[in-house]
From Swiss-Prot:
This is Small ribosomal subunit protein uS14. GO terms for molecular function: rRNA binding; structural constituent of ribosome. It comes from the Bacteria. The keyword tRNA-binding does not apply. The gene is rpsN. Belongs to the universal ribosomal protein uS14 family.
Length: 101
């Protein structure tokens, strides 16, 4: 089980990323637009640097919804590999069966 503080930190990052998503996308588009002047692009880059560090969506980490484990998380289920195995064997995940060929 992950520490509660680590899970809370991830939730904080999600909230910040959602809050600044529009501004982040706008500045990112301006900075990448080759048709704009160098001054505008530099100003956009400075604007990106002034945003909070945790507002960057790449800093988010997928975690298991049950255990908070950061590695081995399947996006489709939002669960770690160990919990997927447990729940699948118990029949709690619809449509998931043990492979046999």
């Amino acid at each position: 089980m992950a520490k509660v503080a680590l899970i809370q930190r991830e939730l904080k990052r999600e909230k910040l990323a959602a809050k600044y998503a529009a501004k982040y996308a706008e500045l990112k588009a301006i900075a990448a637009d080759a048709k704009r002047s160098d001054e505008e692009r530099d100003a956009a880059r400075l604007g990106l640097q002034k945003l909070p560090r945790n507002a960057n969506p790449t800093r988010q980490r997928n975690r298991c919804e049950i255990t908070g484990r950061p590695r081995g998380t399947f996006r489709q289920f939002g669960l770690g590999r160990a919990k997927i195995r447990e729940l699948a064997f118990a029949g709690d995940i619809p449509g998931v069966t043990k492979a046999s060929w």
